[in-house]
Amino acid sequence: MKCLLHYANFLEMAELEWFTFPLRKADRCLIQYRGFLIRERDAGKLMPSTVSEYMRSAISFYRWALSHGLLDVTTPLWRDKAVYVRFFDSVGFERTILRLTTDLSIPNKTHLGLRLEDGLLPVSAADREALLELAKTSSSQELYRMLALGFFTGMRLGSICDLKIQTLENAVEDPVAKGLFCINIGPGASPPVRTKFGVTGRVWIPKPLLDDLLEYANSLRRSKRQARATSENKYLVFLTRYGNPYCANDSEQSTSVNTEMVTFRRKGMQAGIKVASSFHFHQSRCTFATELATIALSTTDPINAIALVRDALLHKDEATSLKYIKFVTQTPAKQAAANEFTRAFMGINNADKFQP
């Protein structure tokens, strides 16, 4: 349903009808949707796998509509073609399967190289401080605290928007790390807090941030929002000015946050913060994970570092955590290579510059 909703939103945005297929192919809704998806993928707004799934779902919908007589067109919507896929089974024998595809399908072209969660990269410590200072002075109190939670706990936006006041009140200080508290999130926590893949676990939160959130939870600003909220939403830490949750049920996305992030990026560019032009909320989580991996590798072996990152970020498996470890271990080599190339280039430039 999410895929079809995306297609329906595109049709509404482009002011197109789903059942209109003119003779000119470029004017057809499916062709325009395909081009839109490819542009979104190339701009980094959608993952290649997501784009392929969206297009596949749209084609499946039209197959269903045609088979049930809901669509009457005289021109073919696409050309079917057979594709043979070879693979090796668990025993090691080569197998071949026949798949039916179309000329409208979008191949899942993955990017080469190491990619972190959602294909985003962390920001530097200096950029993090600049972004937080900008959010504190130029954005809403809610966005500032959400970004602080992302940068210093690594929680996803869906979990932050579903955070309960009681979750903060139940925080327990880590016995071996003074100044760090632990909060329980996930479907198995009490109260439950939404997490991706339904993983239950503990998240670290610094004491100053915890104290600030508890103070905000009892502030007049939030009390006014709580008064407008329904009984089931009154105990959420973050509420919109209309008393609604920032994220819909079972959603990792927030329209309110996305809208404010657009304004935030614009103000960041005006303030001269270059990283703000392409900054996404999820980069706060990437930044936390990268810094945690760096600290972990400096104090323990890679195996324990992977386990630490996995537990702190509530990864479903260790494969995602391993990406951060690899990213951190590759960074010094990249920096050394960049410095060497810069020195070599400057040497060539200077030699040319002062050559008689």
What does each model-found stretch correspond to?
Residues 313-338:
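Catalytic-site neighborhood detector that most strongly recognizes the C-terminal catalytic loop/helix
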Residues 206-276:
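Active-site/catalytic core of tyrosine-dependent DNA strand-transfer enzymes
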Residues 163-212, 223-229, 233:
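Conserved tyrosine-mediated DNA breakage-rejoining catalytic core shared by Y-recombinases
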Residues 68-72, 150-179:
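Short, charged phosphate-coordinating catalytic segments
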Residues 1-94, 133:
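N-terminal core-binding DNA-recognition domain of tyrosine recombinases/integrases
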Residues 339-356:
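C-terminal secondary-structure termini that scaffold catalytic or DNA-interacting sites
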Residues 258-311:
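Short, basic (Lys/Arg/His-rich) helix/loop patches that form interaction surfaces
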Residues 125-157, 305:
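Basic, Lys/Arg- and aromatic-enriched nucleic-acid-binding interface segment
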